């Protein structure tokens, strides 16, 4: 038997030519369903966005097949010449985009990028400070259920009860009392600008490293719509899929060569083996997009849209935590309406408005129920929505929440149908992926 005749026995006919629709109808149907969901519903989850077709193509490229342990020019595998090309492109574009000297583009996720920083700078049991989860922090900033809270000693700081802003006096007091090795500025549900300069002053006073996790607002930094954490931060981390509008992944940035070497060692071989080269290629594409002039307009529009949405939500009788927003997101406190975040998330989803339930500062409800929802504008802005559209969306959110307040978790079906019709009109006016 020849190799040619044996081939069908080791792979099915059409292995290199058959498209997903015929190769696996079940997975294909799920992907088509997700495409339709994204096309017909308005995405308001602050941590989600809509990538370009080019980013999707790079993510689904033949780099999926390639193993590339190590770094460009120093790989443990052969055949990495094109992997080196895309990784070097991603590195150089990230450095230019954020105005820093060193970039590691290999972290597979936001959690892994932050874990790599911990591995590079801390020893198990060392203390560090991060924004409390209940005040808008992230799991990797010291939550007791996360590795960061299990292997290290977290010292949480929070927001003030009266205005829901970070209490910098409390940050300074806690730092002086506990002498942490690391202080983290950044969060997942904080709508105001961070005082990077003050954080660095506090870090210097107690001899701590300053990490800025700008995962949520890095796209705004790239577009000049938010202050940069440089030169204040020793190290900056960011996911690449939120306001930066790239694939789901992470990066580590610094201006310090010695720290850069530590972070490289912490990512590989410390935390990861072979990087996801197809995702690195997509990061390079996204960074290239963010370097274009239109991205500055995009970033500015995200903030303008968020402010318009916050005002519209308030006009609809809802409360916005801290009174508004300086970035792309806001927390809406539903306590006065006696509506839970869980009920609002489900009701809004029935109305084709996708958001997530979220705890609000000093929330008395559990994280599985919550008293609030988190709203964001990056995905809608990518569609092409401007202030007018987001003012309409804010009013629609108010209508759905009022229906829940009247009727309980089942909501008002007639209102939700009317809102669905309005959402369908908006999505038809601003379509996405028309050729998919």
From Swiss-Prot:
Keywords: Amino-acid biosynthesis, Cytoplasm, One-carbon metabolism, Pyridoxal phosphate, Transferase. Its EC number is 2.1.2.1. Gene3D superfamilies: Aspartate Aminotransferase, domain 1, Type I PLP-dependent aspartate aminotransferase-like (Major domain). CDD domains: SHMT. Pathway: One-carbon metabolism; tetrahydrofolate interconversion; Amino-acid biosynthesis; glycine biosynthesis; glycine from L-serine: step 1/1. (6S)-5,6,7,8-tetrahydrofolate binds at residues 133, 137-139, 366-368. Its main location: cytoplasm. It is found in: Cytoplasm. GO terms for biological process: glycine biosynthetic process from serine; tetrahydrofolate interconversion. SUPFAM superfamilies: PLP-dependent transferases. The record marks 241 as: Plays an important role in substrate specificity. GO terms for cellular component: cytosol. The keyword Transferase applies. Its cofactor is pyridoxal 5'-phosphate. GO terms for molecular function: glycine hydroxymethyltransferase activity; pyridoxal phosphate binding. Belongs to the SHMT family. Homodimer. Catalyzes the reversible interconversion of serine and glycine with tetrahydrofolate (THF) serving as the one-carbon carrier. This reaction serves as the major source of one-carbon groups required for the biosynthesis of purines, thymidylate, methionine, and other important biomolecules. Also exhibits THF-independent aldolase activity toward beta-hydroxyamino acids, producing glycine and aldehydes, via a retro-aldol mechanism. This is Serine hydroxymethyltransferase. The lineage of its organism: Bacteria, Pseudomonadati, Pseudomonadota, Alphaproteobacteria, Sphingomonadales. The gene is glyA.
């Amino acid at each position: 038997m020849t190799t040619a005749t044996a081939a069908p026995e080791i792979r099915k006919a059409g292995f290199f030519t058959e498209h997903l629709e015929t190769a696996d109808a079940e997975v294909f149907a799920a992907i088509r369903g997700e495409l339709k969901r994204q096309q017909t519903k308005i995405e308001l989850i602050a941590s989600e966005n809509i990538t370009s077709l080019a980013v999707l193509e790079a993510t689904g490229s033949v780099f999926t097949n390639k193993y590339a342990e190590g770094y460009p020019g120093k790989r443990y595998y052969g055949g990495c010449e094109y992997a080196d090309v895309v990784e070097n492109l991603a590195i150089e574009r990230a450095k230019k985009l954020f105005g820093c000297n060193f970039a590691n583009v290999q972290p597979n996720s936001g959690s892994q990028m932050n874990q790599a920083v911990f591995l590079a700078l801390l020893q198990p049991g060392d203390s560090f400070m991060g924004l409390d989860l209940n005040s808008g922090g992230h799991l990797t900033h010291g939550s007791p259920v996360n590795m960061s809270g299990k292997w290290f000693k977290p010292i949480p700081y929070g927001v003030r009860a009266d205005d829901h802003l970070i209490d910098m006096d409390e940050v300074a007091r806690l730092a002086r009392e506990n002498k942490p090795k690391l202080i983290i500025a950044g969060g997942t549900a904080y709508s105001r600008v961070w005082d990077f300069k003050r954080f660095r002053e506090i870090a210097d006073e107690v001899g701590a490293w300053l990490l800025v996790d700008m995962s949520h607002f890095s796209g705004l930094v790239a577009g000049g719509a938010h202050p940069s954490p440089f030169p204040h931060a020793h190290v900056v981390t960011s996911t690449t899929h939120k306001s930066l509008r790239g694939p789901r992944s992470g990066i580590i940035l610094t201006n310090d060569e010695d720290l850069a070497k530590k972070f490289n060692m912490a990512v590989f071989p410390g935390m990861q083996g072979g990087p996801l080269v197809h995702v690195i290629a997509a990061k390079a594409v996204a960074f290239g997009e963010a370097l274009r002039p239109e991205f500055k307009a995009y970033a500015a529009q995200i903030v303008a849209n968020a402010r318009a949405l916050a005002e519209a939500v308030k006009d609809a009788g809802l409360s916005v935590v801290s009174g508004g927003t300086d970035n792309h997101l806001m927390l809406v406190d539903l306590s006065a309406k006696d509506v839970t975040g869980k009920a609002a998330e489900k009701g809004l989803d029935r109305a084709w408005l996708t958001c997530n339930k979220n705890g609000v500062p000093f929330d008395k409800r559990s994280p599985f129920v919550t008293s609030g929802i988190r709203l964001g504008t990056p995905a809608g802005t990518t569609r092409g929505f401007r202030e007018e559209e987001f003012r309409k969306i804010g009013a629609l959110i108010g209508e759905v929440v009022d229906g829940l307040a009247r009727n309980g978790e089942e909501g008002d079906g007639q209102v939700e149908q009317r809102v669905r019709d309005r959402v369908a009109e908006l999505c038809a006016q601003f379509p996405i992926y028309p050729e998919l």
